[in-house]
Amino acid sequence: MPICIPDELPAVNFLQNENVFVMTSTRANIQNIRPLKVLLLNLMPKKIETENQFLRLLSNTPLQVDIQLLRIDNRKCRNTPAEHLNNFYCDFEQIKHQNFDGLIVTGAPLGLVEFEDVAYWKQIERIISWAKEHVTSTLFICWAVQAALNILYGLPKFTREVKLSGVYYHSTLNPLALLTRGFDESFFAPHSRYADFPEQVVREHTDLDILSSSEDAGVYLLASKDKRMVFVTGHPEYDAGTLASEYLRDLAAGLAPKIPINYFPDNNPERKPLASWRSHGHLLFSNWLNYYVYQITPYDLTYMNPTLD
């Protein structure tokens, strides 16, 4: 959250030059505060586990956030009780006339499935199109990034021959970017995907800012210049044991997966992994909520005209 100081205080310019968010008294006196409405479109099979992961990150901020869980359709889910879905999730038809401050679209285990073969592809297209008019800022995770880049920018699907799995070093590329404010110059983040995001293709075919990348994992963090769209190609929400669970699952299925990179101590799957990305994940979501949602969303959501002014 910002600090509030007098407009004329010399520290205003000093702190702003250091990329510290300062709110002058003039702006603070006219600022209205209300809970933020955030929609979570959960595409993951283990929905309760995914809810817990994202809600943990969304809760680490002074802002009050009202969460609405959204499912893509009413088909049965093998990994989540129907009672849970019926009690806590809404369908798109129930909320399509509402506006929201934020939307999060989770990943999905669809890395080897062509877009046209995704059972709910039409629904994904519809929701992403709807979000442009009804949501201040949308955050896409992993597979959802690939889907959104195709829908919004026409980028084709790029697939790795070998699944990218592990915890990788990343670098921040713009020291003044609001989304990475407070980040270490290098940090860890987990990846678990077949999707590939060639940096040259992103630069040539979109106007997105690349805010963070990894020498081994590639592009990690992208954002539109108006802050309406954010793309995270990894999984900062993952628990310490999520990659281990995926590795053991694939091993049991006979897929001969590689041991996740830089994850198990001494590269030994028998040893308990530790989360080295937790602080980064919390800061990423805190920055998104503050700078990309709260600071630009209209007080009255009836009028969806997010602005930096």
UniProtKB/Swiss-Prot annotation:
GO terms for cellular component: cytoplasm. GO terms for molecular function: homoserine O-acetyltransferase activity; homoserine O-succinyltransferase activity. Gene3D superfamilies: 3.40.50.880. Keywords: Acyltransferase, Amino-acid biosynthesis, Cytoplasm, Methionine biosynthesis, Transferase. The record marks 192 as: Important for substrate specificity. It catalyses: L-homoserine + succinyl-CoA = O-succinyl-L-homoserine + CoA. InterPro entries: Class_I_gatase-like, HST_MetA, MetA_family. It is found in: Cytoplasm. The keyword ATP-binding does not apply. Its EC number is 2.3.1.46. The active site is at 142 (acyl-thioester intermediate), 235 (proton acceptor), 237. The keyword Acyltransferase applies. It comes from the Bacteria. GO terms for biological process: L-methionine biosynthetic process from homoserine via O-succinyl-L-homoserine and cystathionine. Substrate binds at residues 163, 192, 249. The record marks 111 as: Important for acyl-CoA specificity. Pathway: Amino-acid biosynthesis; L-methionine biosynthesis via de novo pathway; O-succinyl-L-homoserine from L-homoserine: step 1/1. Transfers a succinyl group from succinyl-CoA to L-homoserine, forming succinyl-L-homoserine. Belongs to the MetA family. NCBIfam families: metA (TIGR01001). This is Homoserine O-succinyltransferase. It comes from Photorhabdus laumondii subsp. laumondii (strain DSM 15139 / CIP 105565 / TT01). The lineage of its organism: Bacteria, Pseudomonadati, Pseudomonadota, Gammaproteobacteria, Enterobacterales.
